[in-house]
């Protein structure tokens, strides 16, 4: 019988915040690279393809995180396993983690360690901005010429004679 991780019917923001605050209090407080005044902050979570997606900043890192969503059953995975996911922002590599009392989750480090010059407000704004960016559709200029497939195969660029 395989174990499965049940999804969250509502946003896990409060549980994630409490779990990271406990980690900060219990085991991270004496590390030399910690941002001295950055509190744990969790962005709002957004449902994307059935999964809860957001970002978290702590005194030691800023990460994108994904938790199982409503009616989801994730297979139990090995902590530290790597998984590549295609998000609107692009392909990102996530690592399986586990928060005591919460769930397994996927995490992609965006910044570690944090700059000590970053204010609390800047850190929280950056966390919210990153949560929006990873789910933002990429914008391109349709008037910019693109190299065709043949040009890519044969080393030619747009505008060169074939």
Curated annotation (Swiss-Prot):
GO biological processes: protein maturation
Pfam family, one: NiFe-hyd_HybE
InterPro entries reported for this sequence: NiFe-hyd_HybE, NiFe-hyd_HybE_sf
Molecular function via GO: preprotein binding
Domain of life where this protein originates: Bacteria
Family the entry assigns: Belongs to the HupJ family.
Protein name: Hydrogenase-2 operon protein HybE
Organism: Escherichia coli (strain K12)
Organism placement in taxonomy: Bacteria, Pseudomonadati, Pseudomonadota, Gammaproteobacteria, Enterobacterales
Gene encoding the protein: hybE
